[in-house]
Regions:
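A preference for well-ordered globular domain cores
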Residues: 1-90
Length: 90
């Protein structure tokens, strides 16, 4: 009898769509998107030109911390570490 072993599948990358990224801000999404603070606008503009958001990129945490420092009640680690849902994937 021949046994066949399959190599384990590599884990999926921690990538989500730009829309899913903004949706993770919850009820803070619209105030953040409307904010004219230069730090907040920097995150919005940077995210908006991307095909997807790589949640493993340390710059994502830095950007979220800038948004938080601008006065928005968000939890950067929760936004980054929440399990990725199938509909959030690019």
């Amino acid at each position: 009898m021949i046994e066949v072993f399959h190599a384990p599948q590599p884990p999926l990358p921690n990538h989500i769509t730009v829309g899913a990224f903004f949706d993770r801000f919850g009820d803070q999404k619209w105030p953040i998107l409307a904010d004219t603070n230069p730090s907040v606008q920097a995150l919005i503009k940077d995210a908006s030109v991307r095909a997807y958001i790589n949640l493993d990129d340390p710059q994502v945490l830095t950007g979220l911390q800038m948004v938080q420092s601008a006065g928005h009640d968000i939890d950067p680690p929760a936004i980054i570490n929440a399990p990725i849902q199938p509909e959030e994937r690019p």
